[in-house]
Design a protein with these regions (language model features):
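Short, structured beta-strand segments at or near domain termini in extracellular proteins/domains
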Residues: 120-138
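Intrinsically disordered, low-complexity segments enriched in small/polar residues
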Residues: 41, 97, 115, 130-132
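A generic structural signal for short, non-catalytic loop/turn and secondary-structure boundary residues
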Residues: 33-36, 109, 129
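Extracellular receptor-binding modules and their adjoining Ser/Thr/Gly/Asp/Asn-rich linkers
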Residues: 31-78, 134-138
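Extracellular attachment/recognition segments
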Residues: 56-117, 124
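Alpha-helical structural elements
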Residues: 38, 104, 127-129
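Fibrous stalk/shaft segments of extracellular and virion attachment machinery
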Residues: 1-40, 49
Length: 138
């Protein structure tokens, strides 16, 4: 009987250790999901534009979830900036405090990706060989 109790206690101890390990893993995953992340990146424009050539940023590897806010800015002196927020289907470039004409971008969100396109490469933030930086919060 003592040997059976000892075996039962060993099994209970092993089960308790496994439960504690899973609880710790679950708590860690909950913290990871709750912590806001900031991602900074850059790209070089390829000159394409329009619906068949959208610019896409994928945050799967960097944020691991959809971004809550994305800002894209030209580094090449024209000071254009594009702001993207989930749920937006359109966004326009801005220059300092001014709206820039003919820069309407159609925006789509899919999983951890955001894509946009405009009728011009500069409006789409994709001018050939121009440098762009972005940051995303997620």
């Amino acid at each position: 009987a003592a040997q059976a109790e000892k075996a039962d206690q060993s099994a209970l101890d092993a089960l308790a250790a496994e439960v504690a390990k899973k609880a710790t893993t679950a708590a860690l995953e909950a913290v990871r999901a709750a912590v806001t992340k900031l991602v900074v990146g850059s790209y070089t424009g390829n000159g394409s534009c329009g619906q068949s050539h959208p610019r896409t940023l994928d945050f799967t590897a960097t944020l691991g979830r959809p971004p809550k806010f994305v800002a894209v800015r030209s580094k090449d002196g024209d000071h254009r900036c594009l702001f993207l927020i989930p749920g937006m289907t359109n966004s326009n470039n801005h220059l300092s405090d001014s709206y820039i004409m003919d820069t309407k971008n159609t925006v789509t969100w899919s999983g951890n990706r955001v894509s946009w396109y405009a009728d011009s490469d500069s409006g789409q933030m994709n001018r050939l060989d121009s440098n762009y930086v972005y940051f995303a919060i997620g």
